[in-house]
Amino acid sequence: METEETKQNQTAAHAKTASVSDMTVGSPLRQITKFALPLILGYILQQMYLVIDAAIVGRWIGVGALAAVGASSSIMFLVMGFCNGACAGFAIPVAQSFGAKDYSKMRLYVANAVRISAVMATVVTLLSLMFCRRILQMVNTPADIFHDAYIFLMLQFAAIPLTFGFNLFSGQIRALGNSRQPFYFLITSAVVNVLLDVVLILGCGLGVAGAGIATWLSQALSVILCLWYIRKRMQLLIPKGDERRFDNKRTSILLNNGVPMGLQFSITGIGIIMLQSANNALGTTCVAAFTTSMRIKYLFTCVFENIGVAMATYCGQNLGARRMDRVTKGAKDAIKLMLIYFVFTFALIYPFADWMMRLFVDSGEAEVVGRAAQFMRIANYFYPALGLLTILRYSIQGLGFSNLSMLSGVMEMIARCGVSLWLVPALAWTGVCLGDPVAWCMADFFLIPAFLWVQRRLKKQAKK
């Protein structure tokens, strides 16, 4: 009869030939860079799609339609941020189990994560669809763009189960050190999305509804590709027999990681909604400028975000292997990468911000271009604060202290609410531009001592 030890040995042998990467050995800088690069390229590609999407909407439908999509962005961050954060949290125990070479427990986490995600996706979708109109009213969406914003947002909410699916399965693939395949799936999805944008917006004349439908269909494709790859090339993740059972302990651990991370994004999203609401009250021009600048900002800042994502998997695997020395070295190397990239962004944004903004709107919209360029330049000065935030936050998450990372989201929310209540009324658009920098700095004031405390605690535990 086959013993559990035999099963583990067979699984370990399969892991060596599967499309996985052990981040507990080798140069930390090389491992982090190797893992982060496909993530960065994938998200740059995804953000470039958003840039193209905004250009199509802004130039062929109009500034009003662009503002309608932008008015929905902070609400989308609130809801989709919860989905993304929860699924990222579910991947942490998977990464830790993989690092510890406990593959049976890893698959038990996978099975229970799928159950939890299905329930969460259903509940979040129903609540979002029910309260969509009321939320748009609460954030002071201008009347002239309300209808388009409502249609676009409803279509995005209908795709929440697909968002959950892609983030769950791609997160599990990345937990095993493979960031390449999700990158390839994003390429395919983005190309399909752009083609559908052209067909549905320009060809069929569906307006912002066409943009929403295109996103829905491309997300469905990305989920199918993830499932296909896991079944064909990463069977190490597929639960078998008793590994499919419901497990209270594993479910509790998954929720303890996923819910705080999901809430962290949503709490941050509340602050962004407050800032969006204050900006909406300044009129359609400021809404369009905010939309334009945010699209370009995400194109640049996704690099910081994905260095952080790499750190979550890196720290999770090394914690499982009890290699805290590598965690410290990895964090230092990630900060070096972040600072090098900041210099690159400054060289591009400071001289060329106005030109970038003209990609979105006609040259006659000088006020929109000027305001958006101002937003980009102010934010760029504080990119090191953002880079430090993402590295420390995701490292803390990967080490299993998701509650602390959630508190950093609370710090961001408090900062953005304060800016919305005091700086925006006093400084108007300049106050809006200061929203992100103030939030990033306030989160760092919390995360720096929190990360040092987590390190000391885990090193003491490792010596016992």
Predicted regions and their residues:
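Short runs within selected transmembrane alpha-helices of multi-pass transporters and secretion channels
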Residues: 87, 155-174, 182-190, 211-224, ...
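Residue-level signal for short hydrophobic patches within transmembrane helices
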Residues: 25, 29-48, 52, 75-82, ...
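Helix-terminus/linker motif at the lipid-water interface of multi-pass membrane proteins
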Residues: 48-67, 136-143, 199-206, 266-299, ...
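Short alpha-helical transmembrane segments in multi-pass integral membrane proteins
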Residues: 1-36, 94-159, 203-259, 315-382, ...
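Hydrophobic transmembrane alpha-helices of multi-pass small-molecule transporters
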Residues: 78-81, 125, 193-198, 223-227, ...
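Transmembrane helical elements of multi-pass membrane transporters/channels
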Residues: 34-53, 155, 189, 218-222, ...
